[in-house]
Amino acid sequence: MTTKSLSILMLMVNSAAAQEGWWMKEPIRWVQTNLRQTDAGLDAARLAGQLADMRANVVLMGMGGIAAYYPTAVEFHYASPNLPAGRDMFGDVLREAHARQIRVVGRFDFSKTRQAVFDAHPEWFFRQTGGQPVIYNGLYSTCINGGYYRGQAMKILSEALDKYAVDGLFFNMFGNQSRDYSGRPVGLCHCDSCQRKYRQLYHKDIPETPDDDYRKFMFTSSREVAAAIGDLIREKRPQAGYFNYIQEYTDGIMSESNTAVARPLPLWPYSASDHVNRARNSEPGKMAIDLNMQFVDYWWRFATVPRQEIALRAWQSMANGGALTFEVNGTLDLQDRQALETVKPIFRWAAAHEQYYAGQSSAARVLLLGAPSGSGRTFGEEPYRGLFRLLSEEHVPFAVADNMDWVSGAKQREFDLVIAADWAPAELRQYVESGGKLLLASAHAPEFEVAQVVRTESDVKGYVRVRDHAAFPSLKDTDLLMLNGPFTEVSADGAAALTLIPPSLIGPPELVHVDMKDTNTPAMVTRQLGKGSVTWIPWNLGGMYYLHSLPAHAGLFRDVMDRLNPRRQLRTNAHPLVEIALMRQGGRTLLHLINLSGHSQTGYFPPVQMKDIQVEVAGDFRTATTVRKPGNLTVKTVGGHSRFTVPQLLDYELVILK
């Protein structure tokens, strides 16, 4: 193992160094106020009263970095020019919030600072290829490898932690950013610190565009600073939580469910479920805080997204064991109040039923692998998202993880089936050989041998032939499946149930596919490894379903799942757009149902009411109680499953099983 690989491995190993704090023990209803400099004179009692009225119990608000909201004595740290003389706004909010049992998390942003700091210490700052700094609205971008992050920031944090009994700290825009707020690329940092460190590690110059080595370099650099910040917080305020957009060294893993006008379609209505599920199952000892961003895009921070999108994210976060959150820009005195008025009743309902929203863990027996940020490789979202959708629409309870900690050790968990898209690491072999089942749907070969690879074609516009309809009952009305994209040819081992049809003529109509030829090239293989098995679909099933939603691809997935996982953990007649999460909490099981039927193309509308949803959950449960629409359901035990009917689903329902 190389020194570079070892350092990254140690950073990943240390990612579990989190304390068991209030964020894991208490139900969280979290409001983030992204304060402007001009908000430095806000009425602290009014803000705390507004938070208490909506039953928020955590507020994340501006503390320092770009602008301090308290008097600071640290050189090169500046209070907001709008902070009234003699006023300590942050201290006032802390006092008023704590008086109402509301925790306060301070927000810092060390990614940018004033020109005066640049003039005094130009070596602390991000430098583009030609040596010029990155300037946005008069603020200069710092570098994660420079003295601002690695020295000055620690002085600022030390003062803040000594002065205030904060409940936690959060860090915005952590590390070097590749684009500014307007979306303009700024390139890679070529400051002296970065160039020297990169050359020492990789024995070459920083590239013009990011490659695998550079991504690892940035990953390692940011985690070094994250570790130092974590150590400082735990030294000075051991009861305070550490929250960041990374997994390593933190207590809470931050993410955002947000929108952007230039983001490629289709929209991703599972955003909060995706983020929270992944964080809670990748790092079970850390809290997932997916920020419910109410604004449309940076240019329109005061215009809110649809009410139903805000509500959907809220239910998804709670259903997957994460914090209920809401973000605003400025104070709660908003010009567009639609999103705020949408979440207020959800916050109040969650407070009235908070006993169900702390200490949840996934009960799923199927695992979907995401891709880790520290691998150096880039992975497309489409294959993963397509498999995520298929699992949700088939109502298969599943956990998501982007590491292999679950294979062995303290975090070991047992799964009946593991599903992977483009990331299939070598550690999966241990899981399979011990008796596990793995479904791999990707043209990328796994990091261990399943079948001999002949070659990979990057773009195949052909078909998959169904040779054995008995194996695929969902495909009884079709002999062909669309194939578009990369395809890996592997060695055949007997007759294949699915085979490749390569591209053929597509026009004019008189010549369409007149030269179509079948092959014996398998489009799916199954191999035994030790006590377990691997089923490999060597093409992009997930990506095609994500983009095109073809029933044939869904049918193939359904039939493969039935073969690999015949004893389903959950069976239901629910519509595919009813999302279901199966969770454990102490001695009871929680079944969350979320109605996604209001999502259509680029819109979110009130969901269509669902009635008489029949559910069978593996296990012997004697009682089933609905919470959103209170009621006791009749439970029958059939073949090892407990059967009951949910009479009505509007936006969300919670069923308590005992």
Task: Describe every region a protein language model picked out.
Residues 1-9:
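Sec-dependent signal peptide recognition
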